[in-house]
């Protein structure tokens, strides 16, 4: 950020500035001496006016390339160079891999692979008379430019091969390998290892480890062990270059929360060819840098996979058919030759040899013989997409897109909720056993019959959700902890109910609506109002009956019914759950089964003419037993009089003048006349009839 301009230095005019390496943005890895305090000293033979980048050896380019997942072979300098070589039709210069073996042997040493399904190939080579020191400036500079710090010459060589060849490598200090052997096996249950970053991990049989004769010394494909790391005193090393099963490395890295450069390479795929090439390159560098001497003791355990090219025959006409253009045979041969596929054309048949490093092109099974789309992709990306001409369909039937009834109903439901000021939330489709315990569900509850995920993101997300209530309660708790003490949320998502475990068929996947409200102004009747609004928006009617649920208040919970079918529930969260989640306000939960509710999606609305006569309203307060529900009272009122249009509960009261064990509930009852206006006497008779029915049915009295 310093601007260099004309100034005076000790009384003399100066048009430049003497800089340190730090001021130029250089580090010790990029240029020797740049990391020290003081001015950066350049070579004595440097010419005035020369470009500093050239003098410091930094006249280089760094490419930031976004790779697609199907091209793991391009995760290296060599892989990109192959592509550039094919595009520019320039010869590929392979890294030097020659070295000289001495007659020295590591007597009695052996290598075993006990889990060949997880380790198709394992190579090891013994190097002695090792001298640990700094890497040369050119190597440190190149490593720094690709984001890696120099450590020591031996370790730097393994990192250099990783970036250059794309082959993860590791070096063991032989003085710490006990039992004179290396064994590749599955870890034992609860076996432990301390990795190079001094973190201890507990493993299981799903993890692959590299062991000596006594203990694990590396977590295969992820990181080496601290007990065999390269030290300043190291005198002999055993180099490892292997191919590990990508799925196993991915699962191990995620389960242990251990992502490394090596695991990233293995997860995308490393081929057998790179295993051999990487080892040869590392040994060449050891010899070139004078770091050690290469012995004749080496091992290459191969389970039968070959690094020879795999033949493949496809139809030229099918390749052109996929592309929609005619690519000349000469062009196809040229392109495939440049890509190192050794092509031959005989009539309509194109035969190619797929190199081992192009695993994305290899047949995946005996029936995987029609790979012409892959060949077409290789041809067109080199031939040029600009050769593909615009074409129009000769005839096509245009259909209008749109939502089906279920999608329309779900969208309308969401809009209804949003108009009520309820915010939509989204959660993971997973939860944990702790969430089921939070809901205090009994052991035989269907919600506890949850599908376990084989490879969970973490243990808190190890089960497929069987209810949305736990996620909503946790969301309310998180909001309150962040200082939001009131709010309304909803989520529409799927739950998964298996018929039995372990799974023998697809689970019952159901869309569910979950609404959560919290705050000092929220109540049971708020949630009931939300439910009624949903029903009104669909031109249906909900009825409510008391229900007992382990996570809801025993007297403030109801099940929701529509035409006699149970479609959900709502109620106040139980006090012990609110306390467990440290909630500071009351919270309410509702779940509606949208699979059941979808029966009424798209229902045709029926309209009635507006009455010519004025509606009559009466406020009625009743005294009743505490165990009588609001729904029972409302249903009884409707049965007593056919002119009842609407019933609204506006007050519930206990104590004072109300006898013990009783409560008062006050309703606004609206009567809608149809044929004639109602006078006072007629409405009074309606009220008397309602009171009589309530008295007979529930021993309910009109409050004076």
Positions of predicted regions on the chain:
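RNA/tRNA-interacting regions in translation and RNA-turnover enzymes
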Residues: 1-406
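Glycine-rich, charged/polar anion/phosphate-binding loops
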Residues: 3-4, 48-52, 110-113, 193-197, ...
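Short flexible coil/turn linkers enriched for glycine and charged/polar residues
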Residues: 10-12, 35, 57-59, 118-121, ...
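Beta-rich nucleic-acid/ligand-interaction surfaces
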Residues: 99-103, 353, 397-398, 402, ...
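A carboxyl-terminal module marker
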Residues: 338-345, 360, 364, 499-502, ...
């Amino acid at each position: 950020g310093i601007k260099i301009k004309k100034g005076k230095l000790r009384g003399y005019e100066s048009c430049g500035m003497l800089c340190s390496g730090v001021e130029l943005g250089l580090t010790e890895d990029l240029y020797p001496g740049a990391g020290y305090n003081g001015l950066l000293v350049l070579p004595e033979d440097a010419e005035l006016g020369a470009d500093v980048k050239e003098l410091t050896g930094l006249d280089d380019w760094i490419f930031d390339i976004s790779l697609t997942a199907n091209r793991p072979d391009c995760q290296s300098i060599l892989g990109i160079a192959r592509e550039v070589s094919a595009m520019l039709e320039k010869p590929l210069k392979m890294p030097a891999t020659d070295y000289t073996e001495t007659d020295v042997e590591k007597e009695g040493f052996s290598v075993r692979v006990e889990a060949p399904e997880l380790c198709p190939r394992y190579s090891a080579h013994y190097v002695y008379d090792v001298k640990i020191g700094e890497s040369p400036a050119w190597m440190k500079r190149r490593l720094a430019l690709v984001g890696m710090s120099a450590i020591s010459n031996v370790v730097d060589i393994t990192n250099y091969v990783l970036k250059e060849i794309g082959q993860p490598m590791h070096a063991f200090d032989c003085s710490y390998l006990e039992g004179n052997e290396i064994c590749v096996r599955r870890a034992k249950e609860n076996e432990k290892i301390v990795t190079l970053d001094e973190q201890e991990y507990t493993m299981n049989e799903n993890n692959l480890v590299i062991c000596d004769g006594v203990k694990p010394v590396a977590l295969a494909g992820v990181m080496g062990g601290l007990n065999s790391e390269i030290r300043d005193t190291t005198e002999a090393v055993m180099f490892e270059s292997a191919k590990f099963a990508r799925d196993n490395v991915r699962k191990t890295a995620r389960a242990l929360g251990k992502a490394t450069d090596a695991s990233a390479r293995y997860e995308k795929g490393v081929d057998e060819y790179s295993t051999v090439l990487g080892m040869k390159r590392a040994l060449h560098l050891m010899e070139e840098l004078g770091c050690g001497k290469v012995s004749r003791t080496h091992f290459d355990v191969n389970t039968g996979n070959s690094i020879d090219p795999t033949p493949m025959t496809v139809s030229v006409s099918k390749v052109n058919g996929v592309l929609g253009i005619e690519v000349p045979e000469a062009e196809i041969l040229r392109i495939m030759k440049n890509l190192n596929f050794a092509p031959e054309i005989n009539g309509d048949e194109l035969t190619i040899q797929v190199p081992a490093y192009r695993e994305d092109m290899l047949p995946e099974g005996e029936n995987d013989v029609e790979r012409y789309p892959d060949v077409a992709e290789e041809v067109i990306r080199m031939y040029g997409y600009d050769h593909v001409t615009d074409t129009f369909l000769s005839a096509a039937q245009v259909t209008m897109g749109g939502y089906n009834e279920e999608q329309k109903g779900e969208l309308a439901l969401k809009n209804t909720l949003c108009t009520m000021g309820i915010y939509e939330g989204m959660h993971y489709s997973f939860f944990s056993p702790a969430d089921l315990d939070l809901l205090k569900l009994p052991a035989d509850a269907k919600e506890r019959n949850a599908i376990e995920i084989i490879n969970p993101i973490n243990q808190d997300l190890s089960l497929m959700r069987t209810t949305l209530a736990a996620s909503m309660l946790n969301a309310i708790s998180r909001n309150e902890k962040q200082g939001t003490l009131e709010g309304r949320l909803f989520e529409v998502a799927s739950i998964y109910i298996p018929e039995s475990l372990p799974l023998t068929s697809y689970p019952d996947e159901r869309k569910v609506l979950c609404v959560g409200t919290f705050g000092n102004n929220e109540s049971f009747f708020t949630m009931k109002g939300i439910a009624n609004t949903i029903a009104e928006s669909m031109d249906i009617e909900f009825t409510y009956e008391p229900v007992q649920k382990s996570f809801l208040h025993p007297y403030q919970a109801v099940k929701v019914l529509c035409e006699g079918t149970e479609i959900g529930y709502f109620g106040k969260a139980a006090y012990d759950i609110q306390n467990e989640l440290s909630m500071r306000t009351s919270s309410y939960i509702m779940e509606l089964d949208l699979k059941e509710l979808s029966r009424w999606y798209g229902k045709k609305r029926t309209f009635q003419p507006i009455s010519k006569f004025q509606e009559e309203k009466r406020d009625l307060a009743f005294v009743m037993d505490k165990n009588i529900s609001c729904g029972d009272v409302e249903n009884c009122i409707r049965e007593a009089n056919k002119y009842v249009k609407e019933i609204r509960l506006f007050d519930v009261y206990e104590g004072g003048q109300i006898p013990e064990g009783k409560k008062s509930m006050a309703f606004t009852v609206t009567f809608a006349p149809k044929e004639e206006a109602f006078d006072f006497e007629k409405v009074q008779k309606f009220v008397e009839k309602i009171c009589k029915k309530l008295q007979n049915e529930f021993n309910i009295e009109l409050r004076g």
